[in-house]
């Protein structure tokens, strides 16, 4: 009996559209990116901070778990398909959210996200309980992900600000 390997995608969920990941900086419109990306891994291999990995469908996806984006533009320069926007444009429209797992919300003193945030988009304000609570200023945030990388409980997540 011969097995059709192309049909295995139904069992593994690969038939779904390969989206819901954060694409590399300057990758632009997701539908254009997914249509023209050859999944060659050139951008993944060029990433100096190792935040790019193969995501759904083998497309490059950002993972802020261990590091931040330095906006070095190496991923864009490595792409043989010229899919990336010019460096002088905004890298991406990401919105970071501090979730309920945040240690400060659990009455545990922690300010690692603030300490790692170079543009100082995260500040801690006093509360009646005595534990300072984080506030994220999205106007100051550059989307580097340093806060998410430094969070010991992975309470900080990123998503696109606008439909991508």
From Swiss-Prot:
Binding site for [4Fe-4S] cluster 1: 37, 40, 43, 47
Record has ATP-binding as a keyword: no
Entry binding sites for [4Fe-4S] cluster 2: 69, 72, 75, 79
GO terms (BP aspect): response to oxidative stress
Protein location: Cytoplasm
Note accompanying the cofactor annotation: Binds 3 [4Fe-4S] cluster.
Cofactor(s) the protein requires to work: [4Fe-4S] cluster
Molecular function GO labels: 4 iron, 4 sulfur cluster binding; metal ion binding
Subunit structure: Interacts with the cytoplasmic NapA precursor.
Name of the protein this chain belongs to: Ferredoxin-type protein NapF
Lineage, highest ranks first: Bacteria, Pseudomonadati, Pseudomonadota, Gammaproteobacteria, Enterobacterales
């Amino acid at each position: 009996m011969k097995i059709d390997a192309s049909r295995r995608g139904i069992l593994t969920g690969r038939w779904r559209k390969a989206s819901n990941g954060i694409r590399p900086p300057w990758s632009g419109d997701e539908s254009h990116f997914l249509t023209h990306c050859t999944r060659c891994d050139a951008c993944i291999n060029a990433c100096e901070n190792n935040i790019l990995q193969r995501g759904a469908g083998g497309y490059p996806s950002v993972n802020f778990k261990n590091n931040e984006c330095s906006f070095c533009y190496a991923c864009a320069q490595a792409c043989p398909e010229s899919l990336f926007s010019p460096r002088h444009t905004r890298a991406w429209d990401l919105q970071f959210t501090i979730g309920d797992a945040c240690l400060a919300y659990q009455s545990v003193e922690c300010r690692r996200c603030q300490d790692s945030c170079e543009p100082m988009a995260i500040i801690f304000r006093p509360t009646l309980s005595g534990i300072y609570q984080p506030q994220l200023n999205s106007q100051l945030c550059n989307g580097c992900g340093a806060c998410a990388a430094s969070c010991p409980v992975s309470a900080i997540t990123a998503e696109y600000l606008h439909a991508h």
